[in-house]
């Protein structure tokens, strides 16, 4: 097969001609799986971080006719400047059209000729030229009514044109007001106040590897019936040799259990359990560094004020997924309310105890899980929060030298020694949602 025959993007190319580099990962100590990895240029995003789809239409037959057939949707979808320009031109065209008609009527009736007597009544009073006819057209359609120019009973066609212009003016006004109101009430801009974390993370949750990302609502108004979904997009070659450039695979975020429906009052971490049905089941940390895929995440719901459905989108490339990280807490309890600190929304911290193997190898017990009592960032934050509460109460006598209260020091020693699981106690802050 020659290089020219492989110019087709759907043809199968060899590794040498495509510029791919082979890297073999060792399987020792759980840091590899013995697979052959390839490093290649990352493909373009299908969905940008701001939610826009990275697509361009080409070679569309009868595109203009199809768009004009759905004029209302076209006016709602286009930019404000173009919509206002279209309506301004529509008003100007209607004024000019009927101005020309009234001028022609005046010419045909002889109203522009010098009057020899006072016995003839003109079709339109005080219309002696085109400019006067144009002004009469504007006064008729906008119902200004200065009182100088008016139609008479002399010409039936002039009366009919006044009625026709009034109807046309009402149609243009109604169409313009409807399009502007529909454009203003669209929930598209509501997605600007729905936030996705910059990165997704992979970490252990209840003994299982999970893919997690965070969503938040920057407004106090709620998103009714909010629910999330996700898809993995990557190229694939079928068993028959067919090349699918963007194969879409659903990622389960708890649809069967109802976990995909969320109460988005505070930032929430969305969780996808990497199990046998997950497309990420066989991907390890090394695979993640070399693989080429995109995870599209979607948040949908109804705007509380208008009950219209809105949708926010984002995506994560493989190099934007942090293996062995967790999100920092953003929800803290202070006095009689909860405080959300969005400065920590995108921040993560590393969990070194996260296994680097795939979930498949983890299920097959090839690698040991870290201790359930491992001391982590949330525990440290809880201890510090408890100390701050004790300090606010003025109880400083029983503190140890390192700044921890005796109870916090006791729990810390138990965690470090692996002596058991802490009993549940309410904390002032530091609880992640």
From Swiss-Prot:
Intramembrane segments: 130-146
Amino acid composition bias (Basic and acidic residues), ranges on this chain: 396-414
Gene3D superfamilies named among the record's database cross-references: 1.10.287.70, G protein-activated inward rectifier potassium channel 1
InterPro entries from the UniProt entry: Ig_E-set, IRK_C, K_chnl_inward-rec_Kir, K_chnl_inward-rec_Kir2.2, K_chnl_inward-rec_Kir_cyto, K_chnl_inward-rec_Kir_N, Kir_TM
Any one GO molecular-function label of the UniProt entry: inward rectifier potassium channel activity
Induction per the UniProt record: Up-regulated by triiodothyronine.
Tissue: Specifically expressed in skeletal muscle.
Name of this protein: Inward rectifier potassium channel 18
Taxonomic lineage from the root: Eukaryota, Metazoa, Chordata, Craniata, Vertebrata
